[in-house]
């Protein structure tokens, strides 16, 4: 991988599996299929990879497991296939983080790209007025934070290469798909044109304003650029 995440984990993209070092814990991956997200795509009848992405929730070094659990945190890793879904790149359908029972609120997610490049797409609301929408372009080693309560989706920004990333979230996480499914997708569809990603409004929304930006540092949260967010937790 282009960026070392701070512990011994590897993505085996040819069969969408993860390999763990001897000192690393983690589950068998869950694999998400094209069939599962068709209704959220611009073209629900499109063809594309059968397995879109593989996800392992709750991974890390065995020596850190108790500390992660005590802080009610969970670290996950995901690999996305390369390729397209009709005119769109491989992506997730989008969701909002449900109310966490322990926090009594929706919670944020902290992404870190390990290999490839991504657009972390987010929109303020899931209703007819989506409000401000951001497509944040992130490369290996860069971090993106999704605020609580925002609709968000992960998009492989390079259709020629798989995407792998890690993310911190609350341990008692949950996903709310209701608003996204009611609108047959997110407010802007990513469209591949001549190898680049462009954006087309989803007509199911009455209003939305898109901002396409690059990933940036987060000094306000004391995150050190270039240092794995897993390592920063340990330290």
PLM ranges: what are they?
Residues 1-138, 156-235:
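Active-site region of the double-stranded beta-helix
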Residues 143-144, 148-153:
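Histidine-centered metal-chelating micro-motifs
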């Amino acid at each position: 991988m282009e960026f070392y995440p701070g512990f011994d984990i590897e993505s085996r993209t040819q069969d969408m599996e993860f390999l763990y070092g001897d000192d690393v814990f983690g589950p068998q991956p869950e694999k998400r299929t094209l069939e599962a997200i068709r209704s959220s795509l611009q073209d629900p009848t499109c063809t594309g990879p059968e397995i879109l992405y593989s996800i392992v929730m709750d991974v890390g070094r065995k020596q850190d497991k108790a500390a992660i659990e005590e802080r009610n945190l969970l670290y996950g890793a995901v690999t996305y296939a390369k390729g397209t879904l009709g005119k769109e790149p491989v992506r997730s359908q989008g969701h909002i983080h449900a109310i966490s029972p322990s926090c009594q609120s929706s919670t944020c997610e902290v992404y870190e790209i390990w290999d490839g490049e991504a657009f972390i797409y987010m929109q303020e609301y899931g209703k007819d007025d989506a409000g401000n929408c951001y497509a944040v372009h992130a490369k290996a080693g860069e971090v993106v934070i999704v605020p609580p309560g925002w609709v968000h989706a992960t998009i492989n920004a390079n259709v020629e290469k798989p995407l792998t990333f890690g993310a911190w979230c609350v341990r008692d996480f949950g996903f709310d798909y209701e608003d996204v499914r009611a609108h047959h997708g997110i407010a802007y569809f990513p469209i591949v044109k001549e190898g680049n990603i462009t954006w087309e409004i989803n007509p199911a929304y009455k209003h939305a304003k898109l901002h396409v930006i690059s990933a940036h540092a987060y000094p306000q949260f004391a995150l050190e650029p270039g240092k794995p967010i897993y390592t920063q937790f340990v330290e």
